[in-house]
Curated annotation (Swiss-Prot):
CDD domains found in the cross-reference section: IGPD (cd07914)
Gene3D superfamilies registered for this protein in UniProt: Imidazole glycerol phosphate dehydratase, domain 1
Keyword Cytoplasm tagged: yes
Documented EC number(s): 4.2.1.19
GO molecular function: imidazoleglycerol-phosphate dehydratase activity
Annotated keywords: Amino-acid biosynthesis, Cytoplasm, Histidine biosynthesis, Lyase
Cell compartments where the protein resides: Cytoplasm
Gene: hisB
Protein name, as recorded: Imidazoleglycerol-phosphate dehydratase
Catalytic activity: D-erythro-1-(imidazol-4-yl)glycerol 3-phosphate = 3-(imidazol-4-yl)-2-oxopropyl phosphate + H2O
Superkingdom as given in the UniProt entry: Bacteria
A Pfam family of this chain: IGPD
One GO location term (cellular component): cytoplasm
Keyword presence, Amino-acid biosynthesis: yes
């Protein structure tokens, strides 16, 4: 099997981002975004997704973290799409439920070629530490748009905002791991009756 890796660089007047991903990794992460809680969440995606991930980002965080988080989502989405290529032989779909103490989240993914995000999370706090919890949705919207994937992401219950967000990122990682896995029964075919995704 060919290596399923990709690197994307994105530079704007607001950020400079470099993302490298290996879909067949061991869950290792090297993260330097200047947004500590976000780095903690990206590490969950890598570890529980079984992907190796390197992210370097410098942004205008003196304003707020929005541009950095969104642009990392854009670059990561583009890197994922490049890494999985035409999706021949992939499982395509993935789903996971992940608990963290009192919190429970669900992620359901389709590497459909059609971008879409359905996001439901009623978080009890506007911030976890300094991190604005509105940016969770912004990150996943950017990622799904640029990966051309459909994602249904739901925080089903919880009281602690940190737990709720963290188990959502873990669930996304677990679902991604399943979706990008090789389907031995597919015979290398694209997982669609259309023959293309």
């Amino acid at each position: 099997m060919a290596k399923r890796t990709a690197e994307v660089e994105r530079t704007t007047g607001e950020t400079a981002v470099r993302v490298w991903v290996d879909l067949d990794g061991e869950g290792a992460a090297e993260l330097d975004c200047g947004v500590p809680f976000f780095e903690h969440m990206l590490a969950q995606v890598a570890r529980h997704g079984g992907v190796d991930l390197r992210v370097q980002a410098k942004g205008d965080t003196w304003i707020d973290d929005h541009h950095t988080v969104e642009d990392v989502g854009i670059a990561l989405g583009q890197a994922l799409a490049r890494a999985w290529g035409d999706k021949a032989g992939l499982t395509r779909y993935g789903h996971a439920y992940v608990p963290l103490d009192e919190a429970l989240s669900r992620a359901v993914l389709d590497l459909s070629g059609r971008p879409g995000l359905v996001y439901n999370a009623e978080l009890p706090r506007a911030h976890v530490g300094r991190f604005d919890t509105e940016l969770v949705e912004e990150f996943f919207r950017a990622l799904t748009s640029h990966a051309a994937m459909t994602a249904h992401l739901d925080v089903l219950r919880g009281r602690n905002a940190h737990h709720m967000v963290e188990c959502l990122f873990k669930a996304f990682g677990r679902a991604l791991r399943q979706a990008v896995s090789t389907d031995e029964r597919a015979g290398g075919r694209v997982p669609s009756t259309k023959g293309a995704l």
